[in-house]
From Swiss-Prot:
<dbReference type="InterPro" id="IPR017705">
    <property type="entry name" value="Ribonuclease_Y"/>
</dbReference>
<comment type="similarity">
    <text>Belongs to the RNase Y family.</text>
</comment>
<dbReference type="InterPro" id="IPR004087">
    <property type="entry name" value="KH_dom"/>
</dbReference>
<dbReference type="Pfam" id="PF12072">
    <property type="entry name" value="RNase_Y_N"/>
</dbReference>
<keyword id="KW-0472">Membrane</keyword>
<keyword id="KW-0255">Endonuclease</keyword>
<keyword id="KW-0812">Transmembrane</keyword>
<dbReference type="InterPro" id="IPR004088">
    <property type="entry name" value="KH_dom_type_1"/>
</dbReference>
<dbReference type="Pfam" id="PF01966">
    <property type="entry name" value="HD"/>
</dbReference>
<dbReference type="InterPro" id="IPR006675">
    <property type="entry name" value="HDIG_dom"/>
</dbReference>
<dbReference type="InterPro" id="IPR006674">
    <property type="entry name" value="HD_domain"/>
</dbReference>
<feature type="domain" description="HD">
    <location>
        <begin position="325"/>
        <end position="418"/>
    </location>
</feature>
<dbReference type="GO" id="GO:0005886">
    <property type="term" value="C:plasma membrane"/>
</dbReference>
<dbReference type="GO" id="GO:0004521">
    <property type="term" value="F:RNA endonuclease activity"/>
</dbReference>
<dbReference type="InterPro" id="IPR003607">
    <property type="entry name" value="HD/PDEase_dom"/>
</dbReference>
<comment type="function">
    <text>Endoribonuclease that initiates mRNA decay.</text>
</comment>
<keyword id="KW-0378">Hydrolase</keyword>
Length: 509
């Protein structure tokens, strides 16, 4: 019995020992795994830190190399520019030497020509003297007396003519000095600014998302904008802006304002575009009148007919040879006033004539024709002074100036236009070509309006749908294309797009 109890106790003790051993081993293993896990995390963190340091070092090296390359590039660029400047200076020096040699050669040739002429004259005089001596030997006393009187009379006439020519030359020199003095006074007392006109306007966008809204579904919105406004709208990868392009400054300014309002409003669809366009057109009509009125107030030229006031304001949206028409007009008016004052003329009348001398340009883009004839007709219609009308004709040589004020306007116009950099011939030739294309289209029957777009490579012609069929529209496009080909010189091709649109509107109540 005791042995049995002892056996059971031994087994129980062994079981307890085994359990304790198992628990110890388990705890030991967990601690070991925890320790290993901590070591692994520490190593991973160390590796990560080391990798980050290596990355930073690599980035620093790359940045250093980029800066070194940039510095080297700038250094080489400066060297190239210096070399170019040196070459330009050397070329200019060579050109000056060539000019000096040509001038010297010309002078030598002139002197040789003078010497030859003198030699011929001397030989002629010798021959004449010999003939006279031979003739005198056979003359009577009366014949000799008459001969001497005739020669004295000829010599006297020659001396009188010489005196007249000398005084004419003196008068001419004095006149030139006086004219130069007047021009110098005018240019000194008036210092105007000049900025060339561009062919594009930039419209800033709040975000690039608006580009998609302006384009619209399947390009619906941008097509409506271009067709209604008559401009090119360029949307590219440039962030935050779109371009509005047109040779017509007034049309381009209206288009820019329409797009700005649409972007601010957020509602962009064809119906809204038409509504905003009508509103902006009325706004610009009022704006041009206000601008013209402000100019007249500044110059003190009231009263003037309101139609002329509006056209003066509209000159702001017209350019000639890249020179803004309003800026040119104001410059001419102020220069003419100074010149008229120096010559004892009517300053106010010269100022008024200068302001109105190019008034016809405000309508030439819409009407076509000569701005001189249009301007003169407008001033006659609104009872302007005859001197103003004469100045309009005279500044392009259609008439001779009949007053000091007209002459001052002509001189001021030439001075303003002839300044270096004031005008750009290439831009004007392009603008003239585009205007010719539009005028050919608008001259056709049943054409309501026409817009040249894509730098003059396409023209959109809007016709009256009630008076023209689809077949007639096709024939019209071919007719316009043929006339453009015959009358306008242009590179490449021009697409003629005749648009016949019918709208039906009903109201549900």
């Amino acid at each position: 019995m005791i042995g049995t109890i002892a056996g059971v106790s031994g087994i129980a003790g062994a079981a307890v020992g085994a359990g304790a051993c198992y628990l110890w081993l388990k705890n030991s293993t967990q601690k070991k795994f925890a320790h290993l896990e901590m070591e692994a995390k520490a190593k991973a963190k160390a590796i990560s830190n080391e990798a980050e340091l290596l990355l930073q070092e690599s980035q620093m090296k790359i940045k250093t190399r980029e800066l070194e390359h940039e510095a080297e590039f700038q250094k080489r660029l400066v060297q190239v520019e210096e070399r170019n400047r040196a070459l330009i200076l050397e070329q200019k020096a060579v050109e000056k030497e060539e000019e000096a040699l040509l001038l010297l050669e010309q002078r030598i040739l002139e002197k040789e020509s003078v010497l030859e002429a003198l030699e011929e004259k001397k030989q002629k005089q010798i021959s004449e003297t010999v003939e006279k001596l031979q003739h005198a030997a056979s003359m009577t006393q009366e014949e000799a007396k008459a001969y001497i009187l005739e020669k004295v009379e000829e010599q006297s006439r020659a001396e009188i003519a010489s005196i007249v020519r000398r005084y004419e030359q003196l008068a001419k020199e004095e006149g030139e000095k006086k004219a130069n003095y007047i021009l110098a006074q005018a240019t000194t007392r008036y210092a105007g600014e000049f900025a060339g006109e561009r062919l594009i306007n930039l419209v800033n966008l709040p975000s690039d998302e608006h580009k998609g809204r302006i384009i619209g579904k399947e390009g619906r919105n941008i097509k409506a904008l271009e067709m209604l406004l008559g401009v090119d709208i360029v949307i590219d990868e440039t962030p935050g802006v779109i371009l509005v392009s047109s040779f017509n400054l007034y049309r381009r300014a209206i288009a820019t304002r329409v797009i700005e309002i649409l972007i601010e409003d957020g509602r962009i669809h064809p119906g809204r575009i038409e509504e905003v366009h009508e509103k902006v057109e009325k706004e610009f009509e009022e704006k041009t009148y206000e601008e013209g009125e402000n100019i007249l107030i500044d110059l003190g030229l009231f009263p003037m007919h309101e139609e002329l006031v509006k056209l003066i304001g509209r000159l702001k949206y017209r350019a000639s040879y890249g020179q803004n028409a309003l800026a040119h007009t104001l410059e001419v008016a102020k220069l003419a006033r100074v010149m008229a004052a120096e010559m004892g003329g009517d300053e106010k009348l010269a100022l008024r004539a200068g302001l109105l001398h190019d008034i016809g340009k405000a309508l030439t883009q819409d009407m076509g024709g000569s701005h001189v004839e249009i301007g003169a007709e407008l001033c006659r219609r609104y009872n302007e002074h005859p001197t103003v009308i004469n100045a309009i004709y005279a500044h392009h040589g259609h008439e001779e100036p009949d007053s000091v004020e007209s002459a001052a306007v002509c001189a001021a116009d030439t001075l303003s236009a002839a300044r270096p950099g004031a005008r750009r011939e290439v831009l004007e030739s392009f603008t003239k070509r585009v205007k010719e294309i539009e005028e050919i289209a608008t001259s056709k029957e049943n054409v309501e309006r026409a817009y040249a777009i894509n730098a003059g490579r396409e023209i959109r012609v809007f016709v009256n749908a009630n008076r023209m069929s689809d077949n007639e529209a096709v024939l019209l496009s071919k007719e316009i294309a043929k006339e453009i080909k015959d009358k306008v010189q242009f590179p490449g091709e021009i697409k003629v797009n005749v648009i016949r649109e019918t709208r039906a509107v009903s109201i549900a109540k």
